[in-house]
């Protein structure tokens, strides 16, 4: 609605531009996470992809890259275990990591910090579900079908770390 759009513009101006300088990515309305990942892979010649939380492979199946690993304890991907167990055993490095696993602050923060340890130089970590648009979508524990959880708290918290550059894209639930 109109109020939400105005609020988001003001929020962006006050909290994002004032802290980080103006970043302008005019994503088209039909630009989704798989489009962004494909763009980054091609632009940076990435060859190694990790996805945490694959569900039914909605994204994992669309990512075309030389080496890809998908970790999910229930379905999707190609490794059936929790992200914590995966990172304990992993020795591979990745160019691009997409995190869409358990949507809780504590777990997402662990997934991000673990991913940083296995990121190639000039690599990037993308985190989904950072911009819930209602209290119900961010409630923990989950009680709605559509759920972002409190992922956003990990983003706010990790912005305080000096060695990480963190940006939020207003697209596909952030």
Question: PLM features: residue spans?
Answer:
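A short alpha-helical cap/connector motif
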Residues: 1-98, 102-174
């Amino acid at each position: 609605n109109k109020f939400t759009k105005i609020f988001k513009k003001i929020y962006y101006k006050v909290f994002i531009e004032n802290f980080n300088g103006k970043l302008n990515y005019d994503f088209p309305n039909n630009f989704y996470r798989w489009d962004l990942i494909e763009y980054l892979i091609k632009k940076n010649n990435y060859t190694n992809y990790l996805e945490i939380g694959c569900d039914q492979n909605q994204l994992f199946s669309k990512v075309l890259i030389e080496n890809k690993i998908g970790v999910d304890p229930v379905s999707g991907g190609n490794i059936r275990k929790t992200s914590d167990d995966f990172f304990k055993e992993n020795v591979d490095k990745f160019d691009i990591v997409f995190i869409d696993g358990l949507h809780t602050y504590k777990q997402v923060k662990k997934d991000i910090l673990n991913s940083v340890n296995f990121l190639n130089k000039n690599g990037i970590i993308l985190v989904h579900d950072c911009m819930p648009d209602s209290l119900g979508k961010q409630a923990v524990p989950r009680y709605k079908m559509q759920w972002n959880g409190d992922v956003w708290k990990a983003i706010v918290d990790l912005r305080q770390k000096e060695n990480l550059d963190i940006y939020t894209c207003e697209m596909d639930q952030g």
